[in-house]
Amino acid sequence: MSKYDSHLKCSFCGKSQEQVRKLIAGPGVYICDECVDLCNEILDEELLDTNGAAAQPTPRAEPPQKRRTQSSSISFNQIPKPREIKKYLDEHVIGQDEAKKVLSVAVYNHYKRLAVIQSKATGKAAADDAVELQKSNILLIGPTGCGKTLLAQTLAKILDVPFAVADATTLTEAGYVGEDVENILLRLLQVADLDIEEAQRGIIYIDEIDKIARKSENPSITRDVSGEGVQQALLKMLEGTIANVPPQGGRKHPYQDCIQIDTSNILFVCGGAFVGLEKVVDQRVGKKAIGFVQPGEGQTKEKRAADTLRHLAPDDLVKFGMIPEFIGRVPMVAVVDPLDEEALMAILTQPRSALVKQYQKLLKMDNVQLDFKPDALRAIAQEAYRRKTGARALRGIVEELMLDVMYELPSRKDVTRCTVTREMVEKRSTAELIIHPSSLPKPESA
């Protein structure tokens, strides 16, 4: 077959030789490398136990505590209680008690719902038990860097169910450039090692959900493919439906067979900053000053906004740009508080994987003890608060401070201790280094 025979094309997809990487010839037919890959994928999917008859694929190696719970039965007595879930969250996330309680109760009820479904499937449920437990999806509202995503990531470490995180900013309505909403389920399926039954009892966290608000309160004549269109596409998934999930994402491989996933028992947690939502609430509540005293005087702007959001009503979210049908499918709303200076101080030192502990461990591997003076921690928290990006600013500041230290110390065998001072934070000066006595030059004898 000549490399330059432009009339040759794939007998399956019709693409010419110039459009594919490889064209394989057969007796009077040709097949391209893309169609070969597609055939392999279809054969691999036949191995999935979609109907309970085929063999399961070999699971990935996982830590013992995770492997123990995969595909295992759920006993009501083994379900973690809300207090236990919150206690674990307290070890990793500072503050946000209301959001922790909402998540703890929601996850606990999610487990109970799965236990009831399992008892009905095994015939252990009472014959007259006709009550069906419906899920209550969650909406987390709060400024950037206050712990919404960290709460979701921390939950993923303790759950006995698959947990996936998705970003709403990449989603578009079907038929337009971007990701389909079914790709969210694909992430959950991948976390569950392509185990469909396991994925159908999982939890999905959708971040930046406020970015799909429609551009105006009134329905637009033109299509809003990344806003209202995405909200419409998410409705059935949030409520519960049989979704067709393409194993490779759909857009680049349109001819693949889809995997069907029932979303009825998948719990959805949505989070977003919703910048400007407090102004919508203010307009509805109609806060007015009497005399010269302003409401919330003496509070920071962020604290006033958080207090205002305590009076949030569904109509406020509609005015912000969320459609009523979407709001009805996320009935539980929790407001995440902004982080003040004291909270940022606590984040530096108190959590199990606190930032200071991380850098202390890094330097300990070089046999150097790292210390932060209290006034240095205060200066770091103050600078992070001024940056207005929440806890995310802390890592950037500490990374700037420790760059030169972490560059030099691996080559310095004479240093035993490094101390970060307030002056170092404010002026970006050099850290205080303590030299091992044996490395000091010995005084000359007379």
From Swiss-Prot:
Per UniProt, residues of the ClpX-type ZB domain are 1-51
Per its UniProt record, what SMART domains does this chain match? Answer: AAA, ClpB_D2-small, zf-C4_ClpX
UniProt: Zn(2+) binding residues: C10, C13, C32, C35
Positions binding ATP in this chain are P143, T144, G145, C146, G147, K148, T149, L150
The record's annotation in SUPFAM superfamilies points to:
Glucocorticoid receptor-like (DNA-binding domain) (SSF57716), P-loop containing nucleoside triphosphate hydrolases (SSF52540)
Task: Provide the residue span(s) of the region labelled Disordered.
Answer: 54-76
GO MF terms here are: ATP binding; ATP hydrolysis activity; ATP-dependent protein folding chaperone; protein dimerization activity; unfolded protein binding; zinc ion binding
Q: For this UniProt entry, which segments traverse the membrane?
A: none
The keyword Manganese is annotated on this UniProt entry:
no
Q: Which keywords are on file for this protein?
A: ATP-binding, Chaperone, Metal-binding, Nucleotide-binding, Zinc
- For the keyword Magnesium, the answer is no
Q: Which Pfam family, any one of them, does this sequence belong to? A: zf-C4_ClpX
Gene Ontology terms describing biological process: cell division; proteolysis involved in protein catabolic process
Q: Which GO terms describe its cellular component?
A: HslUV protease complex
Q: Oligomeric state and partners?
A: Component of the ClpX-ClpP complex. Forms a hexameric ring that, in the presence of ATP, binds to fourteen ClpP subunits assembled into a disk-like structure with a central cavity, resembling the structure of eukaryotic proteasomes.
Q: Which HAMAP family match?
A: ClpX (MF_00175)
Q: Which family does it belong to?
A: Belongs to the ClpX chaperone family.
What is known about what this protein does?
ATP-dependent specificity component of the Clp protease. It directs the protease to specific substrates. Can perform chaperone functions in the absence of ClpP.
Name-wise, this protein is ATP-dependent Clp protease ATP-binding subunit ClpX
- Which organism does this record belong to? Nostoc punctiforme (strain ATCC 29133 / PCC 73102)
The beginning of the lineage is: Bacteria, Bacillati, Cyanobacteriota, Cyanophyceae, Nostocales
Name the gene.
clpX
